[in-house]
Amino acid sequence: MGQARPQRRKAVIVEDDADLRWLTAALLEESELDIIECESAEAALATMLICGKDVTMIFADIRLPGVMDGVDLACEVRMRWPHLTMIVTSGNPGDRLQHLPPGVLYMPKPWQPLNILMVAERARLGQSLSALNATT
């Protein structure tokens, strides 16, 4: 009997702009993470309830359609899955950043692809983002 292959960790991308979601997914496919795409915070939360134990990172836009935005999602994720790497992004976050829970990384748009890949690699390896928070 062969050994079971270890299940790859997952990253969830939450972005309502289909082109930007596709671009982010294509970029993160360079990491060793499987990608799950969602267009709303509600869809991401539903996904997390199903496969949250396999997810190591969520990358979410702040401004999303629906009842929840990316900050609301970050608060829910931080409460339910505190170990998870959570990144939010926006070109215009307004006053929503003041409501981010501790440990959530904010990356302003336009972000640098290399920064996303560095965060993904740290998440995949289970490393802290504290050093990145100081520089991003």
What are these regions (language model features)?
Residues 18-37:
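Two-component/phosphorelay signaling modules centered on CheY-like receiver
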Residues 1-12, 18, 25, 49, ...:
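Non-catalytic signal-transmission and effector/linker regions of two-component phosphorelay proteins
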Residues 37-57, 97:
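Acidic, metal-coordinating helix/loop segments flanking the phosphotransfer/catalytic sites
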Residues 58, 106-107:
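Two-component signal transduction core modules
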Residues 61-62:
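Active-site residues of response regulator receiver
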Residues 40, 68-73:
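Acidic catalytic/metal-coordinating carboxylates
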